[in-house]
Structures are given as structure tokens and as C-alpha cells.
Amino acid sequence: MLILGFESSCDETGVALVAADHGERPRLLAHALHSQVAMHEAYGGVVPELASRDHIRRALPLTRQVLAEAGRALADVDVVAYTRGPGLAGALLVGSAVACALAAALDRPVLGIHHLEGHLLSPFLSVDPPQFPFVALLVSGGHTQLMRVDGVGDYALLGETIDDAAGEAFDKSAKLLGLGYPGGPALARLAEFGDPTAYALPRPLLHRDTLDFSFAGLKTAVRTQVLKLGEGVCEQPRADLAAATQAAIVEVLVKKSLAALRATRLQRLVVAGGVGANRSLRSQLDAACAKRGVRVHYPEVSLCTDNGAMIALAAAMRLQAGRATARRDHAFDVQPRWPLAALDVGVP
């Protein structure tokens, strides 16, 4: 079974082809990704209308590229999958329209996929895939969640952010520091030259008996420190503040993940989403989990960002597990707001 997957939830257009033979782990045959970072950089953030227009321009050329790299024809595709939500409504509509139009032209079934489920399952494309059950730390864009995962489609929410997500804390702090877009990677790069102990920043909810997160107070503390520094400050204090900010976010993510592992008595942790590519987070999680005999699994770094491979993979795993049915009516809708915990089994 060949599954063609489309991702268009925000500012990346992703297309991928996955092979899912009966009883075997899905294999990624080819994938292509176009990032809109350069286009949105001048605006300091994603402009939804521009994002939608660019998805229209990129979807079919990327599809041709993927098929050529895989040595397959469009007629070889058995199922077409797309990101149904959550995300930007216009961007989601572009991806779903392209996917459903292709499926209708080919007379193939189509399947809508939850964006966060794609991230959650993406480590199954790595050379060292996890086994169920496990705890998942999802740190993607506006989402920060801890989930217990007992199988495909079997997810229980353990904790989530009550305000800003970790990715938003990175991006908003970077903006306060006058760094470029996207802010998270820029802050992480600057943090390499700073002293994380130079500023005492808060770790909200860290010592509370909860697996929920809160990063709004940290953002406020960073703003306060930036105002104290004033304009024209030299680079070192900015690097120190970047390092302290990253240290605060990472400490919360690591300690909450360990608490979730203790609460569930599980020995496997999956970390997925864009923030999962952060080197400081990976190194500290690896060290903390190694002391406790916990296995940690990540996606390949290139698959931490939004991509079509994770959508095609999630579709393959859902179909193999009997947790979804691809449909042939080719009508489509999108879910810009769609909690993963509310994901219904069998809803295309």
C-alpha cells in the first residue's frame, strides 16, 4: 500500500510517499518540504493569507518531486492523506483540497489526519522506533502536552499548557530580545554564548502537584529583564538572558516529563515536535533518563518540523491498526481547533 501524504497546517508545505506493507513497519520512500520562513521573516511571523497562497504554488511541484525521487507514478498511489487540523484554516483548506482533488481524479480513498498525531508517531520512522506503551512529550508550535500512548489512536492526556506553549515561550522571548524569525532557533543559537545562571527566571508550576505547564510568567519575567537592560546593550547580557530563558524552559520540560514517567510507571519517552530538535533539551533529557533506565526516542531532526512524512505515516499506522477507514466520497472539511484527546476513532 502506497500512501501519499500532504501537510499544510501552517508555514511548511510537505509531501511524502510512504509504503505500508501488511504486517510490516511503514517505510518512507521519499519526502519533500518547502519552508516559508524567508517569506514571513519580513513580517516577524506567519501571515495566514500569504501562507495559503504559497501552499497552492508548492503542493503539486513537490508532489512531482516526491514521485520522481521514489520512482513511482501518481497512479501507483493507493491512499491520499492530508492534515485535517489543527492549524490555520486557510492553509488546511489548501492541503485538503489538493489531496481530495487528486484522490477523486485517481478514484482513490482519502484520509484526514490529526497534525499532532503525526508528530507523536513520527519517531516510528527513525532507525530506533519506540514500542507501545510510552509517555509522549509533544512540543509543537502552540502545543505543549504530555500524553500516555498505549497504541495508535489510544491517547490519554496527562498534562498540557494552561497558557503559552514552550514553542511560544521561545519565540516570544526571542522577539523581546530583538532576534530574528523564527525566534526559537535564533534564541537557542544565542544561548550557546551565554551564562544560564546570570538571571534568575521563574519556572511556573514546576513544584506544583500537576503535570500541566505554564510559560506566560516566564515571558513576563523576560520582558522585565529586557526593559532593565534598556536599548543599546552589548551582546553578552542578551546572550546570558537567552541562555537563562532556554534553561528555564528546558528544566520545566525535563522535570515534568520525568514526573509523567513516574506517574505512569512507564520506561519509554517519546519527544516530538519542533522544540524536540533543541539540542539542550535533548542532551538534558538523555542524561536524566539514562540515570533512570528510561529509553528516549526522537524523530530524525529533519522530521521534527512539520512535514508530509509524518502525515503519510500516521495514515499508514491508523489503517494498519484498523483505527480509521479511508473514504471515497472526497468531500472534505478541516478542524482548525482540534484537541488530540478528542480525536475520534474512525473519523476520516
Curated annotation (Swiss-Prot):
Cofactor: binding details: Binds 1 Fe(2+) ion per subunit.
Gene3D superfamilies (UniProt xref): 3.30.420.40
Principal subcellular localisation of the protein: cytoplasm
Documented EC number(s): 2.3.1.234
Subcellular location: Cytoplasm
Residues reported in the UniProt entry to bind Fe cation: H115, H119, D306
GO biological process terms, semicolon-separated: tRNA threonylcarbamoyladenosine modification
Cytoplasm among keywords: yes
A molecular function (GO) term: N(6)-L-threonylcarbamoyladenine synthase activity
Cofactor: Fe(2+)
InterPro entries from the UniProt entry: ATPase_NBD (IPR043129), Gcp-like_dom (IPR000905), KAE1/TsaD (IPR017861), Peptidase_M22_CS (IPR017860), TsaD (IPR022450)
Pfam families attached to this UniProt entry: TsaD
Protein name in the entry: tRNA N6-adenosine threonylcarbamoyltransferase
Source organism: Methylibium petroleiphilum (strain ATCC BAA-1232 / LMG 22953 / PM1)
Organismal lineage: Bacteria, Pseudomonadati, Pseudomonadota, Betaproteobacteria, Burkholderiales
Gene that specifies this protein: tsaD
